[in-house]
Each structure stands twice: as C-alpha cells, then as structure tokens.
Amino acid sequence: MRGSVLLLIDLQKAIDHPDWGVRNNPSAENEISRLLARWRTENWPVWHVRHDSSEPASHYRPGQPWNDFKPEAAPLHGEPVIAKRTNNAFIGTGLEQRLREGGHTSLVVAGVITNNSVETTVRMAGNLGFNTYLVADGCFTFGRLDWNGQARSADEVHAMSLANLHGEYCTVVSAAELLEAFL
C-alpha cells in the first residue's frame, strides 16, 4: 500500500449544504486529514476529484462558492485535480490514462458520497484492475428512501455500499488500519 495514490473524491463545500440532510461519519474529515498529513509527509501521491455539475441548480456548479474544495481537503500546489461531470471519476476525465502513465497500480479512496461517486469510482477502479482500498471512516453518505419508500439511515446506506464493494472491487479498511500498516 505504500506509495498508493490517495484519491479524494468530491470533498467540496457543497456536501455541507443543509439540503443533503443527516449524514453519518461526522469525523470523516478528521480521518481524511490524518491520511492527507501522512501522504504529504511521505511525499506519496495525492489526487483530488472535483465534481463540476452542469445542472444550473446544483451546488456543485463551477464558479460559485459551494463548488470550492473544503479547506481540510484542499489540494496543495502540484497535487492533480481531476474534474468530472458524472458520478464516476473515470468517465470522461482521463483518470485511468494518467494513473497508468504514472505507473500507479494501487489506490486508497476516501470522500463522498459513499453510495454514489465513491461507489461508482471504486467499482470502476476494481474492474480496471487497480488494487483499491476504500477507507470506511473516510467516507460518508446521507439517509434516503429505498425503492419501497422505506427510510434508510445514513449508517445503513453506508454499510450496504461498503458491503457491495468489499472483497470484489476493493478492500474496505479503516483509516487507523491503513496508517498502522505503514508503520
């Protein structure tokens, strides 16, 4: 896992808008900050994915403040920023090509929303053959209604998304497990 690309997905101010509702993992940003500090100290690659929506009403629309990165996850000079317009960081972005050209074969993924952009990106990474680790406590989501109209909590949605991914597309780990593995 040493030297894996830390891929941070959609950590923008828009995710804090009250329209989203109640989220899980309130300390996700702290875990992401710990990972970022380690990656930067070790000079390992940190890549940022930014969602740029073309929808006029979206909080992720470029050119307005909600589209900015959250301060605790803002890119430093020289850290690549991958702009995407879909929920998958590989679609239409050149991400796969850039990773392969750089000789990167392993990813550590954190960000939002677990069951949306994180899940679709991790599935694609696994399908493309990247050795992928998903940081469970470095992601979060929101409650939603299932197809039957039953309310599902953010914790339930998050857990199911992780279950969908673990073992087939990635290895789900905690930030502490990941950081301990590097000691």
Feature names for model-found ranges:
Residues 20-48:
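A short alpha/beta connector and helix-capping loop motif
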Residues 6, 13:
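Alpha-helical bundle segments that constitute or directly flank the non-heme di-iron/ferroxidase center
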Residues 55:
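Small-residue-rich anion-binding loops in enzyme active sites
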Residues 19-23, 58-62:
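Short, solvent-exposed loop/turn segments at secondary-structure boundaries
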Residues 1-5, 31-42, 59-183:
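Active-site-adjacent betaalpha module
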Residues 11, 52, 114:
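A generic "binding-loop/recognition-motif" signal
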Residues 14-18:
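Short acidic, Gly/Ser-rich segments with clustered Asp/Glu that frequently serve as metal-coordination loops
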Residues 8, 44-51, 135:
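Short beta-strand segments at enzyme active-site cores
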